[in-house]
């Protein structure tokens, strides 16, 4: 018989830097889960990823105090900022432009984000990424 699920916990944790301090400790502690076990497992799985890159993770908590977790791809905004070389988006995205993103860079981001996007094909995924970039005040060339 399947284990009884008591809840889902969604967090964004920097790759390789999971520790029991907030927000991880309180979120897992409320449900009685082993915080250090999660931290060690998460850090082990994110060893090959750029340190500090935010990784969304969905933790499934079970009634017997065990858990499983699924890592998602990094947020599109983080990848867009990294590829365009800006530190933050524009406060007025449609009037003040802060950076540029080429179609090739948008395709690279779309390929990386493909498992988490609902787009039917690569072109639709590229348009999704381009829309996110435009809403941050970043010009997308080639679209």
Curated annotation (Swiss-Prot):
Alphabetized PROSITE patterns for the sequence: RIBOSOMAL_L11
Regions annotated as coiled coil: none
GO cellular component terms listed in the entry, alphabetical order: cytosolic large ribosomal subunit
Record PTM: One or more lysine residues are methylated.
Gene Ontology biological-process annotations: translation
Keywords tagged on the record: Methylation, Ribonucleoprotein, Ribosomal protein, RNA-binding, rRNA-binding
Matches recorded under InterPro entries: Ribosomal_uL11 (IPR000911), Ribosomal_uL11_bac-typ (IPR006519), Ribosomal_uL11_C (IPR020783), Ribosomal_uL11_C_sf (IPR036769), Ribosomal_uL11_CS (IPR020785), Ribosomal_uL11_N (IPR020784), Ribosomal_uL11_N_sf (IPR036796)
MF term (GO), any: structural constituent of ribosome
Keyword rRNA-binding (UniProt): yes
Keyword rRNA-binding: yes
Family the UniProt entry places it in: Belongs to the universal ribosomal protein uL11 family.
Subunit structure, as described in the record: Part of the ribosomal stalk of the 50S ribosomal subunit. Interacts with L10 and the large rRNA to form the base of the stalk. L10 forms an elongated spine to which L12 dimers bind in a sequential fashion forming a multimeric L10(L12)X complex.
NCBIfam families per record: L11_bact
Known role: Forms part of the ribosomal stalk which helps the ribosome interact with GTP-bound translation factors.
Protein name per its UniProtKB record: Large ribosomal subunit protein uL11
Organism annotation: Janthinobacterium sp. (strain Marseille)
